[in-house]
UniProtKB/Swiss-Prot annotation:
Pathway: One-carbon metabolism; tetrahydrofolate interconversion. SUPFAM superfamilies: Aminoacid dehydrogenase-like, N-terminal domain, NAD(P)-binding Rossmann-fold domains. Catalyzes the oxidation of 5,10-methylenetetrahydrofolate to 5,10-methenyltetrahydrofolate and then the hydrolysis of 5,10-methenyltetrahydrofolate to 10-formyltetrahydrofolate. Homodimer. Belongs to the tetrahydrofolate dehydrogenase/cyclohydrolase family. Keywords: Amino-acid biosynthesis, Histidine biosynthesis, Hydrolase, Methionine biosynthesis, Multifunctional enzyme, NADP, One-carbon metabolism, Oxidoreductase, Purine biosynthesis. InterPro entries: Aminoacid_DH-like_N_sf, NAD(P)-bd_dom_sf, THF_DH/CycHdrlase, THF_DH/CycHdrlase_cat_dom, THF_DH/CycHdrlase_CS, THF_DH/CycHdrlase_NAD-bd_dom. It comes from Rippkaea orientalis (strain PCC 8801 / RF-1). GO terms for molecular function: methenyltetrahydrofolate cyclohydrolase activity; methylenetetrahydrofolate dehydrogenase (NADP+) activity. NADP(+) binds at residues 169-171, 194, 235. Its EC number is 1.5.1.5, 3.5.4.9. One of its GO terms (biological process) is purine nucleotide biosynthetic process. It comes from the Bacteria. This is Bifunctional protein FolD.
């Protein structure tokens, strides 16, 4: 295929569509419940990238009618203090979703904090209870990025059942839950990772190839089966030889676009979908807590 025939999986456009759907849903639920849905975001320290992500999430909340409760703590905040805040938010009737913005300063135990969140308010879908529900094929709050990938494939009517899917990356944030979601839709799954031998021979088998490894432009055209669906979860800031900064994914976009049938852009692919699924989880909690 030539580069001009590789179609884009436009996450940005779909995220806007989902936001409009959520806006309508909230307008229907608000009179019954008597208040808007609420999302509490906890940020520790002054990581500039995290600050941008939090601001984007708060702006997205405002667009759909979710009230956001920002909680910004200094970098030296203790584990105990944060756990106490989470416990308060668990009990707060205005709050339907709780999000801990990662990464955290090194002295904090992120996993322990995530475990403190009420599973029914777990906006990121990372609590062991919700991951366990995913393993069992039960309904629950799903991890935002993998859920965003699946929703994007669905929107473009990309058939998953019976396909060979390769997920490069095994993190609890993306790789593992996404593999389970693809399996749930009857794909045949391979998970590749840093210890995988002869990675290219595996990725070339993929009808659906997902890159989630955090290595800029790592997946090249030679690693991709012609006509494959390529989903790029990575987002990396690199400095080009001319000194300009650029955001790129884990896939060499220009090269792979000449081989793939579909490809996600970076930015504008999976990033907006992750935020859309976060909002959706918050509204699901809002509806579920009140059984409306």
């Amino acid at each position: 295929m030539s580069s001009d025939t590789a179609a884009l999986l436009n996450g940005k456009a779909l995220a806007k569509k989902i936001q409009l759907e959520l806006q309508t849903w909230i307008q229907e639920l608000h009179p019954k419940i008597g208040r808007p849905p609420g999302l509490a975001v906890l940020m520790v320290g002054d990581d500039p990238a995290s600050a941008v992500y939090v601001r984007n999430k708060e702006q997205a909340c405002a667009k759909v009618g979710i009230e956001s409760f920002g909680n910004h703590f200094p970098a030296d905040t203790s584990q105990e203090a944060l756990e106490a805040v989470i416990e308060q938010l668990n009990q707060d009737p205005r709050v339907d979703g709780i999000l801990v913005q990662l990464p955290l300063p090194p002295h904090l135990d992120a996993v322990a904090l995530l475990h403190k969140i009420d599973p029914n308010k777990d906006a990121d879908g990372l609590h062991p209870t919700n991951l366990g529900r995913l393993v069992r094929g039960e309904s629950g709050l799903r991890s935002c990025t993998p859920a965003g990938v699946m929703r994007l494939l669905e929107e473009y009517q990309i058939k998953v059942a019976g396909k060979q899917a390769v997920v490069v990356g095994r993190s609890i944030l993306v790789g593992k839950p996404l593999a389970l979601m693809l399996l749930e839709e009857n794909a045949t799954i391979t998970i590749a990772h840093s210890r995988t031998q002869d990675l290219a021979s595996i990725t070339r088998q993929a009808d659906i190839l997902v890159a989630a490894i955090g290595k800029p432009e790592f997946i090249t055209a030679e690693m991709v089966k012609p006509g494959a669906i390529v989903v790029d979860v990575g987002i990396n800031r690199i400095i080009r030889p001319d000194g300009t900064a650029q955001l790129v994914g884990d896939v060499d976009f220009n090269g792979v676009a000449g081989v793939a049938q579909y490809i996600t852009p970076v930015p504008g692919g999976i990033g907006p979908m992750t935020v859309a699924m976060l909002l959706r989880n918050t509204v699901l909690s809002y509806q579920g807590i009140h059984n409306t």
